[in-house]
Amino acid sequence: MANNKSAQKRIQVNERNRLQNRFYKSSVRTLIKVFLKNLEIYKTSKSPEGKEKLQKILSSVYSLIDKGTKKNVFHKNAAARKKAKLASSLKIS
């Protein structure tokens, strides 16, 4: 356990930030899985509603990745890499 106030505060701040980072990373992973699952469904049906749904999911993934980057959860290059991978997977289909 920490002996002085500043060390105790750092422990509290680090724990708070760890939980926030975990939330962002988990949410991004979950949304990416949802996007990829819907992408597979779209590849089989090719419906315009499916394409619209994919665009909506993709924009929400982008938004969450950008918010995480702004809060230093993701490095900017890692965020760009994730977004490019998703965009290329949509473009291929």
From Swiss-Prot:
Superkingdom per UniProt: Eukaryota
Question: What biological-process GO terms show up in the record?
Answer: translation
Record InterPro entries: Ribosomal_bS20, Ribosomal_bS20_sf
Q: Which residues cross the membrane?
A: none
Provide the Gene Ontology terms for cellular component. chloroplast; small ribosomal subunit
Q: Which UniProt keywords apply?
A: Chloroplast, Plastid, Ribonucleoprotein, Ribosomal protein, RNA-binding, rRNA-binding
Database matches in Pfam families? Ribosomal_S20p
One annotated GO molecular function is: structural constituent of ribosome
Q: What is its main location?
A: plastid
Where is this protein localized, as stated in its record? Plastid, Chloroplast
Q: Which PANTHER family match?
A: 30S RIBOSOMAL PROTEIN S20, SMALL RIBOSOMAL SUBUNIT PROTEIN BS20C
- Family the entry assigns: Belongs to the bacterial ribosomal protein bS20 family.
The record describes the protein's role as: Binds directly to 16S ribosomal RNA.
Q: What is this protein called?
A: Small ribosomal subunit protein bS20c
Record the organism.
Answer: Phaeodactylum tricornutum (strain CCAP 1055/1)
